[in-house]
Amino acid sequence: LDVGLGVGSGWRAPRAGLALALAAWLGACAGTPRGVLAPVAATVPGASRVDILVATTRKEAATAGEMYSGERGPALAYADITVSIPPDAVRAPGTVQWPRSLPGDPATDFVTLRADTLDRMEATSRLRRQTARSGRRQVLVFVHGFNNRFEDAVYRFAQIVHDTRAEVVPVLFTWPSRGSVLAYGYDRESTNYSRNALEGVLRRLARNPEVDEITVLAHSMGNWLVLESLRQMAIRDGRVAGKIRNVVLAAPDVDVDLAREAFRDMGPGRPKLSLFVSQDDNALAVSRLVWGSGGARLGAIDPGAEPYRSELARENIAVLNLTDAKSDDALNHGKFAGSPQLVALLGRRLAQGQTVTDSRVGLGDRIVQMTAGAAATVGTAAGLAVSAPVAVIDAQSRETYGEHLRNLGQGLGDTAGATVDLATAPARALSGR
C-alpha cells in the first residue's frame, strides 16, 4: 500500500501477517456490539444493580439500544438507567465486562435492566426517590472524557460507583463525544457547547433541598468542561455553590495556563480540589503534540517539580501522582478507574467527604494514535494506512474505521497535495498493493 501524502515520500504498510500478530497482541481490544442499552429481562443472583440518573446534551439516537448519539442535541435531555454488574466472583474491580453478543449474559457481563427517558420534572422526582434511599444524601456527578460513546460513559460510571462502594446518588453528565480518536476537535467543541448545560445541572442540584453535598468527578477532556462550568458559575453568582464541596480532576486534558485561570476565577470559596496526574499518560502526550497544543497538560505535570510544587501548595490542591501505578490501560489514561487500589481509595475518600481510560480503543485506533507526529494530518493519514488491514480483523477498528475516514476527510479539506486513496485502503492493504 503506497500512500502519496504530497510531501515527496512514499510509505509501505505492513501486510496482513503483521496485522494478525498485532491483533492477537491486543485481542482484548476486540469490539463490542452496538445496542447494549436495550434492557434484558432479568439479572442473576449475586449480581449488583446501579441506578444512574443521566443529564445529556447529546442528540437522541435513531438506533434502538443506543439511546443517545455523538451528535449535539437541541436541549438538555434526561434519562434513568439501571445497570446490572456481574457477581464479584467473576470480575476484577476496575473492569467493565462488555457483552460480546446481544443480549448480554448478566452472569458474566454488564447489562442494562432499565433505560427510561425522562422530562425534567420526572428527573427531579427520581432524584428525590434516590436521595431518600441514601442516608447521606450525597450526589456524585461524573463527567467523562474524550472518545466516549453514550454507553461507554454509562457503563464506566456504573463500574466506578459499584467498585468504590460509596453511598452516593450517581448523576452522569454526558456530552456529545463521537467516540472516535480522530474527532478530537469536534469533541473539544462539544465540551464548550455543553458548558451552560452542566452549570445549570450543578446549580439545580445545589438548590435542591434533598441534596446535602455534591462531589464532581471529571476525567480527561471532561475536566475542561467542569472547570469552565464552575468558572462561569463563580462569575455569574459571585462564588461556586456551597454544596459543591469536592472536585476530583482525573487525568485532566487541560492546558496548565487555562487551569490556573479557572482556579483563580473560582475564587477563595471554591470547592476542595484533588488532582490525579501521571507523567506516563500517553493520551495526554498525544493531545499536546498532535492536536496543536504546545502547553503542558495539567494531568501530565510533575507535581514535585517547580513551579508546580509551589503553586499546588499555595492553591491548597491535593495531588495524587499515579505515574508508578500499574494499569491495564495501554495509554495509561484511565488509571483512576482501572486500578482496584485506587478505586478503593477513591471510595473511602468519597465516603468520608475528603479530597482524594477509559474508553474502549481498538487496535487500529491505537496505531492512529501512535503514528501521531508534528504534522497532524500526515501522522493521521499514515495511521489510517497502517490501520487498514487491521480494520478487517479487529472488530472495534472495523466499527470506527469509517468514522476515522470521514473525520480525516473533513480535516484535510482543501489541503493541497493530499492524495490518500482512503476508500480502497483496506482492500489494497490485504492484497499487498
Spans of model-derived segments:
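Bacterial N-terminal signal peptides that target proteins for export
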Residues: L5-L18
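C-terminal motif of bacterial Sec signal peptides marking the signal peptidase cleavage site
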Residues: W25-A28
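Lipolytic serine-hydrolase domain surface
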Residues: R34-T117, T124-R126, T131-S134, V154-A158, ...
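Alpha/beta-hydrolase fold active-site loops
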Residues: Q138
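The conserved beta1-alpha1 loop
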Residues: V141-G145, A251
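Short substrate-entry loop that stabilizes the transition state in hydrolases
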Residues: R149-A153
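Gly/Ala-rich beta-loop-alpha elbow adjacent to hydrolase catalytic centers
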Residues: A218, G222, V226
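A hydrophobic membrane-anchoring feature enriched in long, contiguous, low-charge segments
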Residues: G364-R433
